[in-house]
Amino acid sequence: MELRQLKYFVGVAEDLHFGKASKKLFVSQPALSQQIKLLENELGTELFVRSKRIQMRQVVLTEAGEMFLAEAKNILQLSEKAIRIVRQISTRQKVVTLGVFKLILPERIMGMLEFFSAHFPTVEVKLVELPNPVQVQEFVANAQIDLGMTVLPLISKGLHAVQYAEADYTILMKRDHPLAGQDAVRLEELRSDKWIDHGRETGLYFEQLNEACRQANFSRESNIFHYVPSFDLLKSMIRLGKGVAFIPATLDLTQEPLLISKPITNSDGTPFKQVVIEHVLIHKSSQPIVELMARTVKQGRHGTNPQYPGK
């Protein structure tokens, strides 16, 4: 019996719905069903009543399931308590520096700080704001910060990335752009626009985005007006009406009254599927407490903690 199986069981038992539980637990429904079945086989009894008359993957607890739910919760609580005690002993009087790309939404940053505070109450997290995502990687690589929050795919060697969230791409444009009044923009509607980008080496998913545009029957790369080294310059170029740009939906634009970001759809109206991954970065030779914090972020993504910053 694994703690993971107990978490899965509690998740389904609380929602009484495999579909809802699978989303909260970040696991596919088939995998969730398989783990529950393995747990039932080990216990030698069914924990849920499954009926074809029950629609939408809903279930109800058996009598054994109701009794096991209370015990499973106790086991998980004891496990979490043991982990907290060990962490408190091993992380006393520690100071960790967290560097963040300054355009990440404040809610994401505060969520990460609260998450660390809840799991590492004796660790002081000092926040450092950095102007662009590349610099976050450079600072981690050069040991100027311990952890980094950024949206850029790895370009620096010696780093380890832990995904904590993902975000849809949107189109950043000036508010007087002809398409700014639409609820969403079809990618093919941008075939005549000029583009601002960071370039092949440091751009966010540069090749994937170019391929998406080719699928929409136009070449974005040949329409790129200018490559810029930072998001500040990218925004400045767009404020001047020099083009449009792909940006993650989680970037903070509250201080940009002249700019607006729009959701993207495919030509058939379906949502644009390309997403950008948000990472916590650490150096591969980080001190143990930093590795533990990154590992906790990874575990949090696959758990049910409502405070998790990527939820």
How would you label these PLM feature ranges?
Residues 1-35, 68:
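N-terminal short secondary-structure element
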Residues 40-61:
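A short LG(V/I)-centered, amphipathic sequence patch enriched
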Residues 42-46, 68-90:
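Alpha-helical linker/hinge and terminal dimerization helices associated
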Residues 93-156:
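Central regulatory/effector-binding core of bacterial HTH transcription factors
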Residues 131-136, 141-145, 151, 201-263:
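Hydrophobic hinge/microswitch elements
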Residues 157-163, 167, 232-285:
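Beta-alpha-beta core module
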Residues 161-169, 173-195:
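Flexible hinge/capping segments at coil-to-helix
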Residues 193-217, 289-294, 298-300, 304, ...:
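Secondary-structure junction motif
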